[in-house]
A protein has these predicted regions:
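Short amphipathic alpha-helix that is part of the acyltransferase structural core
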Residues: 1-39
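Generic detector of bulky aromatic hydrophobic side chains
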Residues: 17-26, 67, 89, 95-100
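Helix N-terminus capping/helix-initiation residues
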Residues: 35, 70-71
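Acidic-and-aromatic substrate-binding clefts and catalytic sites of carbohydrate-active enzymes
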Residues: 45-47, 105-106
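Acyl-donor binding region in acyl/amide transferases
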Residues: 71-112
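Short secondary-structure capping micro-motifs at structural edges
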Residues: 38-44, 50-54, 80-87
Length: 112
């Protein structure tokens, strides 16, 4: 069971959520070289739309996921390496998990 002092407040600010997510990125081998400006582009739209989840254990945050609901057109562009634009995060009905970080624990236990 997580230590509640390690979790975000009930109604966290955009800055509080972004701080946790960017902190997790900084210790992720895959994400640690992403510039903060790029992190903003990747993570602020889903945070603003409440399309994220952060996991915690007794030592603090352990991972997060952000998702989008993409139109067919946006999904095709995304599959071809074109990033989702801020106005496209809710462009359709197709659920896409855009980014996932897990620094402790298995991915399998997080997605249950």
């Amino acid at each position: 069971m997580p230590d509640k002092s390690q979790e975000l407040p009930r109604n966290p600010t955009l800055g509080e959520v972004f701080s946790v997510i960017s902190g997790l990125c900084m210790v992720s081998d895959f994400h640690k070289n992403i510039r903060i400006k790029v992190m903003g582009t990747l993570f602020l739209p889903p945070i603003q739309l409440n399309q994220f989840r952060i996991w915690y254990d007794k030592d603090g945050p352990t991972g997060f996921v952000v998702w989008a609901f993409l139109s067919e057109e946006v999904a095709e562009r995304y599959k071809n390496g074109i990033p989702v634009q801020p106005h496209e995060w809710q462009s359709g009905k197709n659920l896409w998990f855009i980014n996932f970080v897990s620094i402790r624990g298995s991915l399998k236990e997080k997605i249950r």
